[in-house]
Amino acid sequence: MSWIEKILNKSNITSSRKANIPEGVWTKCDSCGQVLYRAELERNLEVCPKCDHHMRISARRRLETFLDTGSTTELGSELEPKDILKFRDSKKYKDRIAAAQKQTHEKDALVVMKGTLKEMPVVAASFEFAFMGGSMASVVGARFVRAVEQALEDNCPLICFSASGGARMQEALMSLMQMAKTSAALAKMQERGLPYISVMTDPTMGGVSASLAMLGDINVAEPKALIGFAGPRVIEQTVREKLPAGFQRSEFLLEKGAIDMIVRRPEMRDELAELLAKLTQYDLAKDEDELLGEEMIADDIESSDNEPEINIETNKKEDV
């Protein structure tokens, strides 16, 4: 027995109690590997506070944090996917749909809402990448067209946040048809002179990038988002050449003029509100002043309610 074993008698060593930490309190950044407090990450809209890596965010949460609180109404929620072709690969399409719905609590890969953005009426759509890779299918196309129709009816701008791997192969030609369908709908927005802002997030690929994602009056992207038609590996294997560093990332596309601007997610709401206000000649400052004035009036009323009542009769007697 060594001297260290004599000092550290195993019989006297008690096992330390494991810390009782609830699951999901901490998470790790996909980029820098830093351990992050989950609540802090959620407050920062799933953007790493250490390295600014933009993680995936659900479509519903994106829209609820982007639009004014209490102003949202969901559109097209009654539309559900159907396995018309009875498609089957390694798994039945209807089983894939059921699994995706259970995982995401969404009926399909696009969520559409109308509401206000800093009191300005807008319609917004967002892809849910966790639903079969955000793939575009019949319901996605129908909901997007519904969003366009609502924007035309309300005479307001349309915003779409894309996060998709492309067309959904399980719906074959019906999925590819959505490229033409959504593009034709956006042509009506152009005819009416209504702004359409496309926001491309990581990733925006395939048929979505080749249709609705690149047809914005202003094309915006989040930092380091992968945007393109075919993936980098497919292109390298086809052309048999090494691609440039950062190829198909939003910074590369901005440099080449393929997109108009890059906006960080926490700043997206303010930036797009200013853009739309300029495009529609909407007086954003006036609404903000009115809102501030209403808040000040409410504060004055609340403070006056809390002031002690003055008994005039009692004061008169004291003066005498």
From Swiss-Prot:
The record's Gene Ontology biological-process terms are: fatty acid biosynthetic process; malonyl-CoA biosynthetic process
Keywords for the protein's UniProt record, in alphabetical order: ATP-binding, Cytoplasm, Fatty acid biosynthesis, Fatty acid metabolism, Lipid biosynthesis, Lipid metabolism, Metal-binding, Nucleotide-binding, Transferase, Zinc, Zinc-finger
Pathway membership of this protein? Answer: Lipid metabolism; malonyl-CoA biosynthesis; malonyl-CoA from acetyl-CoA: step 1/1
Q: What is its EC number?
A: 2.1.3.15
A GO CC term assigned to this protein in UniProt: acetate CoA-transferase complex
Keyword Transcription regulation recorded: no
**By its UniProt entry, which InterPro entries does this protein fall under?**
AcCoA_carboxyl_beta, Acetyl_CoA_COase_Trfase_b_su, ClpP/crotonase-like_dom_sf, COA_CT_N, Znf-ACC
Annotated region (Disordered), positions in chain: 295-320
Note the zinc finger regions (C4-type) by start and end residue: 29-51
Per the entry, the cofactor note is: Binds 1 zinc ion per subunit.
Q: Where is the composition biased (Acidic residues)?
A: 295-310
Give the subcellular location: Cytoplasm
Q: Which residues form the CoA carboxyltransferase N-terminal domain?
A: 25-294
Needs which cofactor? Zn(2+)
Stored PROSITE patterns = COA_CT_NTER
Residue numbers binding Zn(2+): C29, C32, C48, C51
Q: Which GO terms describe its molecular function?
A: acetyl-CoA carboxylase activity; ATP binding; carboxyl- or carbamoyltransferase activity; zinc ion binding
Reactions catalysed, semicolon-separated, are:
N(6)-carboxybiotinyl-L-lysyl-[protein] + acetyl-CoA = N(6)-biotinyl-L-lysyl-[protein] + malonyl-CoA
Q: Which family does it belong to?
A: Belongs to the AccD/PCCB family.
What does this protein do, in the record's words?
Answer: Component of the acetyl coenzyme A carboxylase (ACC) complex. Biotin carboxylase (BC) catalyzes the carboxylation of biotin on its carrier protein (BCCP) and then the CO(2) group is transferred by the transcarboxylase to acetyl-CoA to form malonyl-CoA.
Q: Quote the subunit structure annotation.
A: Acetyl-CoA carboxylase is a heterohexamer composed of biotin carboxyl carrier protein (AccB), biotin carboxylase (AccC) and two subunits each of ACCase subunit alpha (AccA) and ACCase subunit beta (AccD).
HAMAP family referenced in this protein's UniProt entry, alphabetically: AcetylCoA_CT_beta
Q: Which NCBIfam families match?
A: accD
The protein's name is Acetyl-coenzyme A carboxylase carboxyl transferase subunit beta
What organism is the protein native to? Proteus mirabilis (strain HI4320)
Supply the source organism's classification. Answer: Bacteria, Pseudomonadati, Pseudomonadota, Gammaproteobacteria, Enterobacterales
